[in-house]
Amino acid sequence: MDIETDGRFGNKRVHHRLGPANGAASSSTSGKVCIHWRAGRCNRFPCPYLHSELPEATAKRPSQSGGGGNVWRNPHSGGGGGRGAGGAGGPNKWGRGPGGADGGPRHKVPDRPCRYFLAGDCSYGEKCRYPHSYSMSDSITMLTPLQGHEKVVTGIALPAGSDKLYSGSKDGTVRMWDCQTGQCAGVINMGREIGCMISEGPWLFVGIPDAVKVWNMQTQAEMNLTGPTGQVYALAVGNELLFAATQDGRILAWRFSAATNGFEPAASLVGHQLAVVSLVVGAMRLYSASMDKTIRVWDLATLQCIQTLSDHTGVVMSVLCWDQFLLSCSLDQTIKVWAATESGSLEVTYTHKEEHGALALSGMPDAQSKPVLLCSLNDNTVRLYDLPSFSDRGRIFSKQEIRAIQVGPSGLFFTGDGTGELKVWQWVIDGSQTK
C-alpha cells in the first residue's frame, strides 16, 4: 500500500487584564506598568498601574453564526484537507499578532451565546438578549448538525473516493452520513466503545479495546488487527506503517503486505509510562503524546525513540505538525510550539496560555488560504487562531466538550461533542455570508 501522510496533523487559572481597570488613575500613575503584573502576581483590583505593555487593540466583534441548510456537499470526493495547516513562519513570528502573548494584548473575549439556547430550551426566542449562535466568528458558518450518536464522538473520517462521512462514538457505533443529503446512511454496531478513527486513502481504521478494525471502502475487505492491550486511543499512518496508541503505553505498528493484501505486525514501540492518547507523523518522525505528560519522538526508519519532550506539566492531549514545527496542547492550559535546533533536537519556541485545559488540535486553511489552528478546550469551546501570530479568530460553542475535529475539502470541517452530536462547518470569505 502506497500511503502518503499529510502533516496533521492543570489547573491554575490564568487572568489577562489589559490596561487599567475602570475608575483607575489615568495620568502619570496609569502610564506606568505594574511591576507585580509583570511578575504575574498582582492581586490589586482595581490596580492604578497598567496591566499591559501596549495599548489594547480594538477588537473586531464577529457576527453570529447559526444553522444553515441541512445539506453539505463534498465537491472533491477524494477527501483531502489533512490535519496539518500549511504555511510558514519563523520562530520569531510566533504569537506576534493580537492575542499572542509576545506581540500585544489578546482580543477582547466575545460574549458567550445564550446558555439556554446551547441547551436547546431558551424560551425567549428572538427576544433573547444573548446571541443564539453556536459560534462567535465572522469567518465560519455552521451548515448542519448531524444527530444520532448517544455518547461522545471520538472519531470522524472522510475516506478518499467516498461520498460518505464516518463517525465513531463511545456508544459503540460507527455511523455513515451521506455527504449529499446529510442523512444517516447506515449504522455499524461494533459492540465496544470506539476510541478513535482515521481514514487513509480507501482505508478506514477504527480503534476499539484490544483491537483495530480495518475496512477497505473500495473492495469492502474487512480485517481485525489484534495485539493492543486496552483501548486504542489514537491511530496514524506513515512510511507504509499503521501505528496504534494503546492504553498500556505501547505503540504498535503494522506493515501492509501486498502479498496477503493485509497488515502484518511490524514492531512494538515502548517507552511511555501511561496511556498514549495522540499520534502524528511528519518529516519521517512519529510524535506520540501521553498521559505521562511527555511527548516522544520516534525515527520512522529505525522505530527508535530519539528524544523525549517533558516541558508540559499536565497530560499532553494532542500533537500536530505544521510546516517545520510541532504543536502540542495539554491539560496544563498551554499550547506549545516546538522547533528544531541546529543539533536537530526539538525545543519550545513559543508557549500560548489558555484559561482552560486543551483537548485537541487541528489545522486547516481558511477561505483565503490563511493557516488557522483549531484548539478544543474543556470549557466546551473550540478556539480559532491565525498562525503563526495566534491572533484570535473566534470561538465555537457546544453543549459538552468537543473531542473530535476533522478537516474536509473546500473549507469544510467537522466537530463532534460529548452529547454525540456532529456539526458541519465551512469557512466563508465574507462575514456577511454567516447566518
Curated annotation (Swiss-Prot):
GO terms for molecular function: DNA binding; zinc ion binding. Keywords: DNA-binding, Metal-binding, Repeat, WD repeat, Zinc, Zinc-finger. Residues 1-30, 58-107 are annotated as: Disordered. A zinc finger (C3H1-type) spans 28-54, 108-135. PROSITE patterns: WD_REPEATS_1 (PS00678), WD_REPEATS_2 (PS50082), WD_REPEATS_REGION (PS50294), ZF_C3H1 (PS50103). Residues 77-103 have a biased composition (Gly residues). Coiled coil: none annotated. This is Zinc finger CCCH domain-containing protein 17. It comes from Oryza sativa subsp. japonica (Rice). The lineage of its organism: Eukaryota, Viridiplantae, Streptophyta, Embryophyta, Tracheophyta.
